[in-house]
């Protein structure tokens, strides 16, 4: 049965957006699509974080969702956090049109991202290839510009 989820991204900055998630079968890939506005032109890290807690803004969402205790990587890497969705690219108008298909996240089961926080970051994610310890944890993606809890949609 197809499952759907949605996330409304908001933050202290002008960055905002709506991201949709769609999974046709329980172990199938998840389509991630939508748009984010108010960004600076270029790449911005895009991750699912562990907790759905936004009581202290995006910082209370915890680290990247990583149930397999792996190092940070890119979305196509074998070694990655479940929540590592790579980067979104904003155009000169600050708009990122998101269209990702990912086979590691899920909307059900052990790797479900429902109830967790989606975050868009200030800087590009170096996909774990930055050559320092922070790269293997966060991809050096910098501060959290906007976030929202991923919820079930109809």
Swiss-Prot record:
InterPro entries: SOD-like_Cu/Zn_dom_sf, SOD_Cu/Zn_/chaperone, SOD_Cu/Zn_BS, SOD_Cu_Zn_dom. GO terms for molecular function: copper ion binding; protein phosphatase 2B binding; protein-folding chaperone binding; superoxide dismutase activity; zinc ion binding. The modification N6-acetyllysine is found at residues 123, 137. The modification N6-succinyllysine is found at residues 4, 10, 92, 123, 137. A lipid is attached at residue 7 (S-palmitoyl cysteine). Palmitoylation helps nuclear targeting and decreases catalytic activity. Succinylation, adjacent to copper catalytic site, probably inhibits activity. Desuccinylation by SIRT5 enhances activity. Its main location: cytoplasm. Its cofactor is Cu cation; Zn(2+). One of its GO terms (cellular component) is nucleus. Disulfide bonds join 58-147. Destroys radicals which are normally produced within the cells and which are toxic to biological systems. Belongs to the Cu-Zn superoxide dismutase family. Homodimer; non-disulfide-linked. Heterodimer with SOD1. The heterodimer CCS:SOD1 interacts with SLC31A1; this heterotrimer is Cu(1+)-mediated and its maintenance is regulated through SOD1 activation. This is Superoxide dismutase [Cu-Zn]. It comes from Hylobates lar. The gene is SOD1.
